[in-house]
Amino acid sequence: MTKIHFRPYNPNQTVLFPQRIDEDIAENDPVRMVDALVEGLNLESFRKLYKECGRSPYHPRMMLKVILYAYMNNIYSCRKIEKLLHRDIHYIWLAGYEKPDFITINRFRNRVKKEINEVFTQTVLLLSSKGFISLNVEYIDGTKIESKANKYTFVWRKTVERNRERLMKKIHVLLGQIDDVIAREKSSENNEEVGFTPAMLAEMAGELRHALEQVSEPSAKEEKTELKKKRKQLKELEEHRDKLQEYDCHPETLQERNSYSKTDKDATFMRMKEDAMRNGQTKPGYNLQIGTENQFITDFALFPNPTDTLTLIPFLQSFSNRYDRMAHTVVADSGYGSEENYRFMSENGMEAYVKYNYFHMEQRPRFKPDPFKAENFYYNEEHDFCICPMGQRMRRIGTRNVKTASGYVNENARYRAVRCEGCPLRCRCFKAKGNRTIELNHRLRQYKRRAKELLCSEKGLKHRGQRCIEPEAVFGQIKNNMNYKRFRHFGKDKVFMDFAFLAIAFNIKKMCAKLTKKGMNWLIRLFYELTTAVFRCWEHINQRNLQKIAA
């Protein structure tokens, strides 16, 4: 029988000259890109977050590397990151054999809630300098992501207003039953129209309690019953006071929203795409808006609006505040097509490849415009009149201003036919009595006409095709590939911080994928060497400045 010779195996063998840990990491491994990129960032703003006295904290650059690399690998739990710092060679190398616990990691994330936004901006500018993006085109889209809060923690504005009115009526009835001069005076001074405040009820309850304490303990049965009744009424008054104070706090939290969650007061109840019961149940969440270019996230923001229409202008302003410039080209779907949005983009010199309602329907081969719809009537701009399908002239009778939820005023011109009685097309035209009246928004029609020209042009067709694989692909990768389907923190500031880490990790991961796909591993090494050299130069200059200050 042939003897089998196995390779020597001794896991407890002592090495005389230990090798460097990064020798077992491939040169084109993404962990090297994370290390190089973070080394090239300016983290001077992180210094103000630490105290000069006490125990020396972990280096923020090391903590940032570890968290970003964990997010790149779909690991968002601080406890799992702590385990990997003891087991995984990539995390051990990034941390330099440091082993912060999960509390320290989570505390660092919460500490850099504002500074991480600046890190994201630096990362995008670095991508722009390397030629991955130009920041001239912004593909915008939104998605609703569920909050960590429970779906049964809702507070509705209408319910609060209705219950507050009922409580006011109960208070008036209760004060009418209390046999006390002070209570009667307060009740007469404050009728149902004026209402009460928690401070008034607290004052009244205190005076009534003081009056009851002055009364000696009665001996008769009827007097005991009456005293017991008054104490019960006092207890009810105090309960109404507490409830009224609770109802008065709700509008401050709601502000312009119609709902919020008790456990996550920044979350708004919305209908999500993931509806397992198919009953349209609302869940607490945020409307996440992102801007992408070449499938890199260039900007992001969180909004309480369930729809996308009111988010476009503040989102474009967010892009301007971040990069001190406006995007030259904006591409978005029909959810953003409104007069206010078109006007803002036109005034800021943007090319708006933004669809409007019924745009896709108009592009169908079998589409035929309905001649009886007001927007399809012939309009004479010179003499300001419309012509109905029967050929009758419709004269201008006035203007109606419509105020939107954002406060913008739409001007709708009103036109009315002279005589619709006996018209053979009346049954198909309208069903109301009298002569037909229509409203037209001429400014919006001009914006739609301009948008249609841009969207149907050769450049517009290219942007329309690109939009389908820009933000939609990013959302698909975030939700399915990176398993980021629900926020893991309470509060808008913490949710924003968590997604900022994810956006940075996503951009680094995308950059590594693009370089590796093109077989440009040598570029990764070059990028590593350049960023490391820049960081060393910046550190040397900063050290010299500190020495001058110390001198």
Identify the meaning behind each predicted range.
Residues 1-32:
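Hydrophobic alpha-helical membrane-insertion signals
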Residues 8, 56, 67, 74-87, ...:
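Anion-binding and metal-coordination hotspots
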Residues 26-68, 442:
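Basic, short loop/linker segments at the boundary and entry of helix-turn-helix/winged-helix-like folds
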Residues 94:
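Conserved active-site neighborhood of enzyme catalytic/cofactor-binding cores
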